[in-house]
């Protein structure tokens, strides 16, 4: 699943949005399944994939999808930050910043 995620990032960075969407979809499906069995290990991967999916959807002007993904990512990251603020508060702040930018550009 990390290979799918990395491949999706490559496609996103090279503006191959359709391929990036396919890879993020697959990575998210795998991470969600893994998080069901072991949330303490994989929830952060779900949040990170949702966050990057939101960037993709924002870049492709699908703002409603991006908002949903940022919001879900933020919920997960806030939960993680409650348990380990040092490790996850920066992720919460970054997600809030991107969500604010999305609302500004909508």
Spans of features found by a protein language model:
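Conserved alpha-helical positions within TPR/SEL1-like repeat arrays
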Residues: 1-13, 44-59, 90-105
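Residue signature of alpha-solenoid helical repeat architecture, marking inter-repeat boundaries
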Residues: 37-44, 83-90
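Ser/Thr/Pro-rich low-complexity tandem-repeat tracts
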Residues: 12, 27, 71, 84-86, ...
């Amino acid at each position: 699943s990390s290979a799918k995620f990395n491949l999706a990032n490559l496609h996103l960075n090279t503006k191959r949005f359709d391929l990036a969407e396919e890879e993020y979809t697959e990575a998210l499906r795998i991470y969600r399944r893994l998080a069901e069995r072991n949330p303490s290990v994989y929830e952060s991967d779900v949040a990170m994939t949702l966050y990057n999916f939101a960037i993709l959807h924002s870049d492709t002007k699908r703002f409603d999808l991006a908002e949903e993904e940022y919001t879900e990512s933020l919920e997960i990251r806030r939960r993680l930050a409650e348990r380990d603020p040092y490790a996850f508060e920066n992720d919460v702040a970054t997600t809030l910043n991107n969500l604010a930018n999305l609302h500004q550009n909508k």
